[in-house]
Amino acid sequence: MKQTTINHSVELVGIGLHKGVPVKLVLEPLEENQGIVFYRSDLGVKLPLKPENIVDTKMATVLGKDNARISTIEHLLSAVHAYGIDNLKISVDNEEIPIMDGSALTYCMLLDEAGIKELDAPKKVMEIKQAVEVREGDKFVKIEPDSQLSLNFTIDFNHPVIAKQAHHFVFSKTAYKEQVAKARTFGFLQEVNYLRSIGLAKGGSLNNCIVLDENSILNKEGLRCEKEFVCHKILDAMGDLMVLGMPVMGKYTSFSGSHKLNSMLVKAILADAKNYEVLIASDPAKEFALQKAFA
């Protein structure tokens, strides 16, 4: 199986979630072995996607280098992960990736428009060789060896609409587009009011976020699926795992995970070479599994 990029450049304009200003996003093809590279076109600064360049995980996953930052990269990266794209230039003219509708649907459509192009170099895949776990109180994320990527996520909120939700997701591009891509980010009205008081969430609205008051959902259209809340957490996790720089084969499990815990997990995996092996996708059985997943 070969490395991939996109066939041709595509672009869109949307609003940043926190600053609330228009952002132009451009996706461009890259040659083999270049990886995922972000670029602040307004500053002329290149930000390669690497764990050491993740500078904040409080409200979103934030990439930073020198004086340049790009926030809320996880939804776009989730779609990039699902489409098996290895090499891509992502340019923005402000400090956020556009939030669009709060899910990854728009980015899936954008990648469909761009098309996928095979390159000459063989694809690299990270295979987890032993269990790695990180914790924060009773919250945890872990990853264990497996012959495919699966994500088992549980959330538990003291809210009548959400309560406790769990979903086991076995990755394939088709399953991702059916179950995960449409799941929107969500927040609580009291938190939104606080965030706006400190200059954040200026671009947030019922058009790009599920908003809940103390007892109900404020969005008139309701949920897109029964498990939209936990499926969005899976969407986020796939984006955060893309910081590893390549697709991963392993069983991911999380209880009340977060961007912070996902970032800690990525760094913990890479901290010990015994935790993983980088495979060149030439093993027939594993290549077949990859081709099936990304079909």
UniProtKB/Swiss-Prot annotation:
One of its GO terms (molecular function) is UDP-3-O-acyl-N-acetylglucosamine deacetylase activity. InterPro entries: Ribosomal_Su5_D2-typ_SF (IPR020568), UDP-acyl_GlcNac_deAcase (IPR004463), UDP-acyl_GlcNac_deAcase_C (IPR011334), UDP-acyl_N-AcGlcN_deAcase_N (IPR015870). It comes from Helicobacter pylori (strain J99 / ATCC 700824) (Campylobacter pylori J99). Zn(2+) binds at H75, H232, D236. Pathway: Glycolipid biosynthesis; lipid IV(A) biosynthesis; lipid IV(A) from (3R)-3-hydroxytetradecanoyl-[acyl-carrier-protein] and UDP-N-acetyl-alpha-D-glucosamine: step 2/6. Keywords: Hydrolase, Lipid A biosynthesis, Lipid biosynthesis, Lipid metabolism, Metal-binding, Zinc. Its EC number is 3.5.1.108. Catalyzes the hydrolysis of UDP-3-O-myristoyl-N-acetylglucosamine to form UDP-3-O-myristoylglucosamine and acetate, the committed step in lipid A biosynthesis. Pfam families: LpxC (PF03331). One of its GO terms (cellular component) is membrane. It catalyses: a UDP-3-O-[(3R)-3-hydroxyacyl]-N-acetyl-alpha-D-glucosamine + H2O = a UDP-3-O-[(3R)-3-hydroxyacyl]-alpha-D-glucosamine + acetate. PANTHER family: UDP-3-O-ACYL-N-ACETYLGLUCOSAMINE DEACETYLASE 1, MITOCHONDRIAL-RELATED. The active site is at H259 (proton donor). GO terms for biological process: lipid A biosynthetic process. This is UDP-3-O-acyl-N-acetylglucosamine deacetylase. Its cofactor is Zn(2+). Belongs to the LpxC family.
